[in-house]
């Protein structure tokens, strides 16, 4: 893709076998059994997101440090959660270095996160994740999807890679972004939402140019009886990393990712034995 000039994604996901991406369990004090289940032998977990307090928090949390250490010892990548929706690209595109409106620049658009955020703030959080929890990479939640935001996102990812050697970067778009993002992150979350939408979802044609290890699907509200169907959809659409749960978002009132699915043993056995293939 000739318009891309940033740091390319790594090739670590090229031969990735089907497995699980854990988008964010509750704090280890509230979900100690769930965190422990991720380290059980044979659990096909690709990575788990650590979100201490809407970020790394203001001081090291010993419970999170212990949970992260156990995951790493079990061979599971630990990713620090960063809110990428507050990367305010219009702040840079629409102002001068002095912060004055650039002549002819459009009026700033409010970001989805409810306010601007300079890159240094995001990097400060990332550095705390590295220093306190020794994370293996980062999960950029609510990552932008438009081409206009690609440059700033690529800039942020490049800085993150400088903070952590061999950092694994997952871009949590939640939908198919502009194809240029595939050259930015190691994995892209191209679906995040309810089963009622996933079962009728379509895949973007450009994803066929990349191996399944580059894509992830996160689906809540999947009934136990439709688990095999969900896994077939992921295989057909070319996503090697998945997270399916029967938990729901309660109409937007509950985080469906905070607890384990009721069929945890079933999904581990299905993916671990290659049922989806």
How does the language model describe each region?
Residues 1-277:
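Glycan-processing catalytic domains of CAZymes
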């Amino acid at each position: 893709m000739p318009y891309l000039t940033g740091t390319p994604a790594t090739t670590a996901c090229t031969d990735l076998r089907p497995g699980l991406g854990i988008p964010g369990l509750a704090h280890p004090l509230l979900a100690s059994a769930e965190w422990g289940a991720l380290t059980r032998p044979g659990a096909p977990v690709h990575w788990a997101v650590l979100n201490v307090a809407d970020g790394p928090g203001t001081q090291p949390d010993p419970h999170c440090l212990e949970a992260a250490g156990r995951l790493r010892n079990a061979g599971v990548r630990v990713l620090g959660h960063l809110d990428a929706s507050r990367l305010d690209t219009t702040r840079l595109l629409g102002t001068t270095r002095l912060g004055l409106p650039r002549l002819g620049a459009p009026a700033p658009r409010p970001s989805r996160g409810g306010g601007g955020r300079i890159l240094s703030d995001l990097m400060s959080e990332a550095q705390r994740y590295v220093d306190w929890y020794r994370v293996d990479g980062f999960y950029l939640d609510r990552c932008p999807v438009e081409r206009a935001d690609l440059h700033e996102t690529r800039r942020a990812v490049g800085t993150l890679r400088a903070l952590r050697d061999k950092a694994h970067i997952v871009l949590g778009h939640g939908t198919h972004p502009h194809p240029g993002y595939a050259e930015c992150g190691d994995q892209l979350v191209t679906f995040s939402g309810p089963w009622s939408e996933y079962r009728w979802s379509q895949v973007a044609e450009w994803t066929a140019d990349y191996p399944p290890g580059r894509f992830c699907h996160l689906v809540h509200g999947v009934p136990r009886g439709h688990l095999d169907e969900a896994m077939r959809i992921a295989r057909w659409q070319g996503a090697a990393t998945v997270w399916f749960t029967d938990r729901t978002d309660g109409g937007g009132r509950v985080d469906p990712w905070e607890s384990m699915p009721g069929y945890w043993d079933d999904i581990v056995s299905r993916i671990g034995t290659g049922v989806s293939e």
